[in-house]
């Protein structure tokens, strides 16, 4: 077998393997031995069929079987090669007395890691967030403590209504005399809400509606069983004492809520900054990666989408197979860059994940898994795939936190978009301008 590198493109080597007549004959004999051992050829005792008869019996398939046997020899030759993805046999054929295989060897792409210090991140101003938190919590407490009493007049924004409804589809009842309590709020534009505003106890409302992406028509019949007026308490010391026994004044309640909000804000801020780092990771590396490697990942993703019956919905959203292919490719390249950035930064900063950290995470996950901490630890010890996922998650978080520590963090007003949102808006504006120019 001769091996010859005929072309190199970024991380991919195109290698030609050539087998001579003796090697082809050896592969043919191997196939003959296999067939005689596992099959019975009509007219011959098992194991006694001659080569020419087996060739005739299998026809063109015999040649394919020989090529498969030679493919296995190539796989054996490459088993110790360090490859990014499995070797891809792009072409194989027998020409005369030689067999030629064209094989793509995908090496790990070369990586250029950029400077990850001083990354620009942003968070909303703490005082604004806390002020909004306190205001929202106070309003929430007012709603929870609202005084509710029957009302004779029509239902209005802020009222509570008790309804009984029946739904028909194609003349068949699919919901019969169901009851529901609804708080009427200004932004709720559901027909079941908008159609009862202004109605009184005992009124009956009927209407038809359809739902998005469906041609089915549903007929609703609603009876107003009761209208309840909600009266919200004034924000004063009496209100504060009624909703929190440990405080005596409204200011004390606000202070308590602010402390709660600060704790929640610090936890949220940590995750918020980590997510910003995650979104920027792809910008921190340059990958010298071939289109052939990306095509491999895209085709595999498409195959998985078809198996999971999600391909058609993806295709509908994309609009065409070409656009969907490019969307897959962009997403895959982005993820490859992010994962590579995590890996290279962890190597450079000598970030390690200890067994203690893995077991601690297993304990924390036990609640979500619905099992004991001891059982969770045992699973992590015996399931290498789960352990690897945990290790990768811990490593990713450590890298994110390190980048945050080295970042430049800017406080912005709560209504000011963060950097990623600005970039998206700029892209949308550019896209709109391009569309207008085309028109």
From Swiss-Prot:
Skewed-composition ranges (Acidic residues): 414-428
Keyword entries, A-Z: Cell cycle, Cell division, Chaperone, Cytoplasm, Isomerase, Rotamase
Record function comment: Involved in protein export. Acts as a chaperone by maintaining the newly synthesized protein in an open conformation. Functions as a peptidyl-prolyl cis-trans isomerase.
Source organism phylogeny: Bacteria, Thermotogati, Thermotogota, Thermotogae, Kosmotogales
Reaction catalysis annotation: [protein]-peptidylproline (omega=180) = [protein]-peptidylproline (omega=0)
Oxidoreductase keyword on record: no
Subcellular location: Cytoplasm
GO BP field: cell division; protein folding; protein transport; regulation of DNA-templated transcription elongation
Main location: cytoplasm
Protein EC: 5.2.1.8
NCBIfam families: tig
UniProt-recorded name of the protein: Trigger factor
InterPro entries reported for this sequence: GreA/GreB_C_sf (IPR036953), Trig_fac (IPR005215), Trigger_fac_C (IPR008880), Trigger_fac_C_sf (IPR037041), Trigger_fac_ribosome-bd_bac (IPR008881), Trigger_fac_ribosome-bd_sf (IPR036611), Trigger_fact/SurA_dom_sf (IPR027304)
HAMAP family listed in its UniProt record: Trigger_factor_Tig
Gene3D superfamilies xref list: Transcription elongation factor, GreA/GreB, C-terminal domain, Trigger factor ribosome-binding domain, Trigger factor, C-terminal domain
Domain free text: Consists of 3 domains; the N-terminus binds the ribosome, the middle domain has PPIase activity, while the C-terminus has intrinsic chaperone activity on its own.
Stretches for region Disordered: 410-439
An example molecular function term from Gene Ontology annotations: peptidyl-prolyl cis-trans isomerase activity
Pfam family, one: Trigger_C
Domain PPIase FKBP-type: 158-233
Family membership: Belongs to the FKBP-type PPIase family. Tig subfamily.
